[in-house]
């Protein structure tokens, strides 16, 4: 039925190519090769999305409430929370609409479903791009605060941060509109993959350089106080562990999704790739998990923000 086809489109334009989908059916029929498909229950997916939604709403509310948090750094953190909020919210909306359509609780025309499909895809893609951009912006902000500490407040002024934020949002919306419109072109998917790799390299280079400077500074303090080297080694190990966790979480949560896009371009008809395509919802779930972890890494470690968060929660009761 036409409506059933429209319902399936809500699963996302980037899920797989038509060639890959049709070939998947042939592969199963002719070879019977087993595919490892991890099923993510809709209830679990929606629950994770709800946790992310609540967490990031609290971050946005705390930053908005406390004027002491209206600095460039917290503006970037707030925008990261807002983009993560949209990532989880758009995926929850898509899943909820699919469930309502499949159960017959929501009946509408195919054209309306198609428009909703396009809107959700643009919202999801733009919020994902924003999330990646603001992770990079936070890394740049921290880098400047360490290497240009005396000039930090003159470099990272609030108006400059606001202009950067506006540019990121506008560029993300325009780019996502083009990506969703031309999603069946290999160049578009490769652009997304290259963008992810660029953000990964940027964050790795900046944070490794910051770690090296911190270790150098700690070594200087130790030499000044004539302490033993194990303390310096312990600091270096802790810093390396923190850096590994930060970049590791980023790569593990985002990497599979962009690996999926890469395989769609290079091996849409291969049986192994077709099996990977069946786990698309797992990759989305990992991104949702990243939106849950981001506030723990970037926001809730701030004592000022935690104090404001307590005030927000107390005022809400």
UniProtKB/Swiss-Prot annotation:
Belongs to the G-protein coupled receptor 1 family. Pfam families: 7tm_1. Interacts with MGRN1, but does not undergo MGRN1-mediated ubiquitination; this interaction competes with GNAS-binding and thus inhibits agonist-induced cAMP production. Interacts with OPN3; the interaction results in a decrease in MC1R-mediated cAMP signaling and ultimately a decrease in melanin production in melanocytes. Receptor for MSH (alpha, beta and gamma) and ACTH. The activity of this receptor is mediated by G proteins which activate adenylate cyclase. Mediates melanogenesis, the production of eumelanin (black/brown) and phaeomelanin (red/yellow), via regulation of cAMP signaling in melanocytes. Its main location: membrane. Residues 1-37, 94-118, 184-191, 267-279 are extracellular. The gene is MC1R. A lipid is attached at residue 315 (S-palmitoyl cysteine). It is a multi-pass membrane protein. It is found in: Cell membrane. Glycans are attached at residue 29. GO terms for biological process: adenylate cyclase-activating G protein-coupled receptor signaling pathway. Residues 64-72, 141-163, 212-240, 301-317 are cytoplasmic. The chain crosses the membrane at residues 38-63, 73-93, 119-140, 164-183, 192-211, 241-266, 280-300. Keywords: Cell membrane, G-protein coupled receptor, Glycoprotein, Lipoprotein, Membrane, Palmitate, Receptor, Transducer, Transmembrane, Transmembrane helix. One of its GO terms (cellular component) is plasma membrane. SUPFAM superfamilies: Family A G protein-coupled receptor-like. This is Melanocyte-stimulating hormone receptor. Signal peptide: none annotated. One of its GO terms (molecular function) is melanocyte-stimulating hormone receptor activity.
């Amino acid at each position: 039925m036409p409506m059933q086809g429209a319902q399936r489109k809500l699963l996302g334009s980037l899920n797989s190519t038509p060639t890959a989908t049709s070939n998947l059916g042939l592969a199963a029929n002719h070879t019977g090769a087993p595919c490892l498909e991890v099923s993510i229950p809709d209830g679990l997916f929606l629950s994770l999305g709800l946790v992310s939604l609540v967490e990031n709403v609290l971050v946005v509310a705390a930053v908005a409430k406390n004027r002491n948090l209206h600095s460039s750094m917290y503006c970037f953190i707030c925008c990261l929370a807002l983009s993560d909020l949209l990532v989880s919210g758009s995926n929850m909306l898509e899943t909820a609409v699919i469930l309502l359509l499949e159960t017959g609780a929501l009946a509408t025309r195919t054209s309306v479903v198609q428009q909703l499909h396009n809107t959700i895809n643009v919202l999801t893609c733009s919020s994902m791009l924003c999330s990646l951009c603001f992770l990079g912006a936070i890394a740049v902000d921290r880098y400047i605060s360490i290497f240009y500490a005396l000039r930090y407040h003159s470099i990272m002024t609030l108006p400059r941060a606001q202009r950067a934020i506006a540019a990121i949002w506008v560029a993300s919306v325009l780019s996502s509109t083009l990506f969703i419109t031309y999603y069946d072109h290999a160049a578009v998917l490769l652009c997304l993959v290259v963008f992810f790799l660029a953000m990964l390299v940027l964050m790795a280079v900046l944070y490794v350089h910051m770690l090296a400077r911190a270790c150098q500074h700690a070594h200087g303090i130790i030499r000044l106080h004539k302490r033993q080297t194990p303390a310096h080694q312990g600091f270096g190990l802790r810093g390396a562990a923190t850096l590994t966790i930060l970049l590791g979480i980023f790569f593990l949560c985002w990497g599979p999704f962009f690996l999926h896009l890469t395989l769609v371009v290079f091996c849409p008809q291969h049986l192994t790739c077709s099996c990977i395509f069946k786990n698309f919802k797992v990759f989305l779930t990992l991104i949702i998990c990243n939106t849950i972890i981001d506030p723990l890494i970037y926001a809730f470690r701030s004592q000022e923000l935690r104090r404001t968060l307590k005030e927000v929660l107390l005022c809400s009761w």
